[in-house]
Design a protein with these regions (language model features):
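A cross-family phosphate/adenosyl-ligand binding-site feature
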Residues: 1-210
Length: 210
């Protein structure tokens, strides 16, 4: 169901960024067109050169291209996308998204996106368990975003608990199932009522609800 879909893959500054390369390859193999948007800290974990080579597109990180002054429109990106996936999503980026802190290209694009947004949190055990993180994730969920819950296991800190970014194969499955469900509803006609309805049987009888 991903063939021909336009996917924004947002990458933030966490050790799980290496999994984003695997996810990128899976998306392309499934036939999707992928545009990478990476935060400045994300580039400390994985190079734009690698991502550009795999995606076949220039990686976007800043609002302007330094050597040409070319403007990258977050509005155009938001309109282009069929879905936006942020994997990994660090506590910092989650907080910015939840509270509208548009200080980088990724969060600005998120705030402009018209497409469904899928967020895969990844962080250490204590950060994941912190009340502020839980609040921000719940806020994002209340906005209509899809939260791909992190898995439990050994973390980069060698602690064991919840905080591992979900595996790329599972994220791909979530996206595939979303588009499959959307396709099954395409073209359907739905009647929405506000109040009781009546279906006439004969001149004196009807079936109704209230």
């Amino acid at each position: 169901m991903l063939k021909g879909k336009h996917i924004i893959l947002g990458i933030t500054g966490g050790i799980a960024a290496y999994k984003s390369v695997i996810l990128l390859r899976l998306l392309i193999k499934a036939g999707a067109e992928v545009q990478i948007v990476i935060t400045p800290n994300g580039k400390e974990f994985i190079t734009p050169v690698t991502l550009s080579a795999l995606s076949g597109r220039p990686v976007i990180s800043e609002f302007f291209t330094a050597n040409t002054g070319e403007w990258h429109s977050h509005v155009d990106l938001g309109l282009w996308a069929d879905a936006m996936v942020i994997a990994p999503a660090t506590a910092s980026t989650i907080g910015k998204m939840a509270n509208g802190v548009a200080d980088n290209m990724l969060v600005t694009t998120y705030l402009s996106a018209k497409a469904p947004v899928f967020i895969a949190p990844a962080m250490d055990l204590d950060m994941m368990a912190h009340p502020s993180t839980a609040r921000n994730i719940n806020l994002l969920r209340s906005y209509g975003n899809h939260i791909i819950e992190p898995a439990a296991g050994e973390l980069a800190s060698h602690l064991v608990g919840k905080g591992r970014m979900e595996e790329p194969e599972q994220i791909l499955k979530v996206l595939d199932e979303y588009f499959e469900k959307s396709a099954s509803l395409a073209g359907r006609k739905v009647l929405v009522t506000a109040g009781p309805t009546y279906e006439k049987i004969d001149p004196v009888r009807f079936i109704g609800n209230y």
